[in-house]
Amino acid sequence: TSSIFGMVAVPGQSAYHATKFAVRGFTESLALEMADTNPNLQIHCVHPGHIGTNIAGTARMDDRVAKKVIEDGKKSIFTWKPPTSLEEMGHEFKQGGMHPSKAAKIILSGVKKNKRRIFIGLDARLLDLSQRLFPKHYHKTWILFVPFLLLFRDKKPLRSLD
């Protein structure tokens, strides 16, 4: 699994982006290398957008970094209410994302359709599109659609996976 942050980058996440871009490059290269070896072999790279998990709440960081993360969160366009603590940031992140059961359904659908890249969530698809249309200035376009994504995010679990 890569991330939408294997397609686009934001300040302050260089190490994270490096790993996610690496996963994307490795997966795409592997898919090309293996293309003629076995017609039944499928290779996919999953690029989730904002999925409601504990990733932000369980992240460990130095106190100085944590303070900067909270300060940066106050300027973020990805949240309605700026966090006052790491715990609050983790809670808001989990509550604000797509339910993991819906993400799983999208992944399975992408695998069934043999998609090489599987984008999870409208946010992931729009961030990817903004990068393709505006390669040097994509981050400046996010303010146009992120508020709508926050309003219409699908946070409900699938009934069969509750």
Which residues does each predicted region cover?
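Terminal low-complexity segments of carbohydrate-biosynthetic enzymes
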Residues: 150-162
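A transmembrane-helix-recognition feature enriched in membrane-embedded lipid enzymes
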Residues: 115-151
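Active-site-adjacent segment of SDR/Rossmann-fold oxidoreductases
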Residues: 8, 29-41
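Active-site helix of classical SDR
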Residues: 19
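SDR active-site lid
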Residues: 36-122
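Hydrophobic alpha-helix immediately C-terminal to the catalytic Tyr-X-X-X-Lys motif of short-chain
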Residues: 22, 26-34, 46
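Residue(s) in the substrate-gating loop at a strand-loop-helix junction
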Residues: 3
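Active-site loop immediately N-terminal to the catalytic Tyr-X3-Lys motif
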Residues: 8-15
